[in-house]
């Protein structure tokens, strides 16, 4: 019998980086379709434009680094980054928002650190935070869900609003943002925080039309869609369960604790879990294998830290949704988390 001598590793995982990225995109489809249904065609238009920008910036940087662009484009990591950023911004954000955002995501947050596998921060969240701090008006002008508008925004109007700033009737983005055409309004989390700041109780804040019996109108279905996609990712072993479970468990625990002691000032766990970018963050953003913790215990700590930070920022921060800030702050703690949670070497 002939024996073959080969060097380690002897066990191989057939899944490559492109395969994993494809699974992430496929499982994000339910959330994308839900967002498109409730918030209009602008979501799909932004996605296509973001992917085109991501591919362009990725190829340009690879050429500047004197490396073949095809190799970088084949892993689809730029496409996933574009996907995550495009669904995180308002559907009718002006086109230059994505240009700036994708530049920061691909060129600064990814390739400035050495490319895929070297970036300490999630590129999409770096871009989102830069945009949110620099252009708060454009980044907080969300459409009202389709069920709360008299007439849904057409594909042509969405396209024109993004690339010209005016819809087919000549209304500017600023006019739409002020509610003249009734197509834009604050997100449920923003409306809840504004109502509390104005002196209303939590129950009074939740009586606004942005909220249903479960959570924010439209947003609850978007989050449930991302939850379904996230569970498929876990079942397919594309991601592990530790970070999402710790994230959602920590957020639920904090909201329950404060709901018990300050019921008039705290949103219920369902509001926190099914509003904003909670499920998108738990399953598709925080689980980034490059910028997340690598040890089993570390992933639990990492996820719990994000969940706690999300609750703190939503409750007392200056922004209604804190997922992006929480993820970046947790990314900063990853080296420390991994150092103290690494398994002991046998015999030491």
From Swiss-Prot:
Enzyme class: translocase
A Pfam family hit: NQR2_RnfD_RnfE
Single GO biological process annotation from the record: transmembrane transport
Modified residues (FMN phosphoryl threonine): 187
Subunit-structure text: The complex is composed of six subunits: RnfA, RnfB, RnfC, RnfD, RnfE and RnfG.
Family stated for the protein in its record: Belongs to the NqrB/RnfD family.
Function: Part of a membrane-bound complex that couples electron transfer with translocation of ions across the membrane.
Protein's UniProt name: Ion-translocating oxidoreductase complex subunit D
């Amino acid at each position: 019998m002939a024996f073959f001598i080969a060097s380690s590793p002897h066990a191989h995982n057939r899944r490559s980086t492109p395969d994993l990225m494809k699974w992430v995109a496929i499982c994000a489809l339910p959330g994308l379709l839900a967002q498109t249904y409730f918030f209009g065609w602008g979501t799909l238009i932004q996605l296509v434009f973001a992917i085109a920008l991501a591919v362009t910036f990725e190829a340009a940087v690879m050429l500047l680094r004197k490396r073949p662009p095809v190799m970088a484009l084949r892993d689809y990591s730029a496409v996933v980054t574009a996907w995550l950023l495009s669904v995180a911004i308002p559907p009718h954000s002006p086109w230059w928002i994505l240009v700036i955002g994708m530049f920061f995501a691909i060129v600064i947050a990814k390739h400035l650190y050495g490319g895929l596998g070297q970036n300490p921060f999630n590129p999409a969240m770096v871009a989102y935070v830069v945009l949110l701090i620099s252009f708060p008006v454009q980044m907080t002008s969300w459409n009202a869900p389709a069920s709360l508008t008299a007439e849904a925004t057409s594909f042509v109007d969405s396209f024109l609003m993004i690339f010209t700033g005016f819809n087919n009737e000549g209304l500017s983005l600023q006019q739409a943002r002020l509610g003249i055409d009734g197509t834009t309004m604050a997100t449920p989390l923003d409306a809840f925080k504004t109502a509390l700041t104005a002196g209303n109780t939590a129950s009074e804040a939740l009586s606004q039309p942005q909220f249903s019996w479960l959570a924010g109108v439209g947003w609850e279905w978007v989050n449930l869609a991302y939850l379904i996609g996230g569970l498929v990712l876990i079942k397919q072993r594309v991601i592990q369960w530790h970070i999402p479970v710790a994230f959602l468990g920590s957020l639920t625990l904090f909201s329950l604790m404060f709901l018990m002691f300050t019921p008039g000032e705290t949103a219920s766990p369902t509001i926190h879990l099914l509003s904003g970018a909670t499920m998108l963050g738990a399953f598709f953003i925080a689980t980034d294998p490059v910028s997340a913790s690598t040890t089993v215990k570390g992933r639990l700590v990492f996820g719990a830290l994000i969940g706690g930070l999300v609750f703190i920022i939503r409750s007392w921060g200056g922004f209604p949704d804190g997922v992006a800030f929480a993820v970046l702050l947790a990314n900063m703690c990853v080296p420390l988390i991994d150092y103290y949670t690494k398994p002991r070497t046998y015999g030491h």
